[in-house]
Curated annotation (Swiss-Prot):
Full protein name: Aspartyl/glutamyl-tRNA(Asn/Gln) amidotransferase subunit C
Binding partners and assembly: Heterotrimer of A, B and C subunits.
Naturally occurring in which organism (per UniProt): Ligilactobacillus salivarius (strain UCC118) (Lactobacillus salivarius)
Gene Ontology biological-process annotations: glutaminyl-tRNAGln biosynthesis via transamidation; regulation of translational fidelity; translation
Gene Ontology molecular function: any one: asparaginyl-tRNA synthase (glutamine-hydrolyzing) activity
Function: Allows the formation of correctly charged Asn-tRNA(Asn) or Gln-tRNA(Gln) through the transamidation of misacylated Asp-tRNA(Asn) or Glu-tRNA(Gln) in organisms which lack either or both of asparaginyl-tRNA or glutaminyl-tRNA synthetases. The reaction takes place in the presence of glutamine and ATP through an activated phospho-Asp-tRNA(Asn) or phospho-Glu-tRNA(Gln).
Length: 99
């Protein structure tokens, strides 16, 4: 399965990335190589290989989840540049236009 520049353009558009023509050619080649490597891996016979769910024998080392009192909300809100209805207001980063 070969990856073409149209597929790379489509994925780049979904990620809101823009490439120059030279970059598009470079990334198209790199993506094609990656897809070919994954295809090679899928052809490996793993019939007698035991299933691996964890690479190591490490156990969960997270601490117990304990609720503690946080910083006063009113004090925190005094330090934000803009707020609205008790929330911190930030610039929009998601383009909701239809593309």
């Amino acid at each position: 399965m070969a990856i073409g520049s149209e597929e790379v353009k489509h994925v780049a558009g979904l990620a809101k990335l823009a490439f120059k023509d030279e970059e598009l050619a470079k990334f198209t080649g790199q993506m094609d190589e990656i897809i070919n490597m994954v295809q090679q891996l899928s052809e490996v016979d793993t019939t007698d290989v035991p299933v691996t769910t964890h690479v190591t024998d490490a156990i969960n080392t997270l601490r117990e989840d304990v609720a503690v009192k946080g910083t006063d909300r009113d004090l925190l809100m005094k330090n934000v540049p803009q707020s609205q209805d008790g929330y911190i207001k930030v610039p929009a980063i998601i383009d909701e236009s239809e593309e």
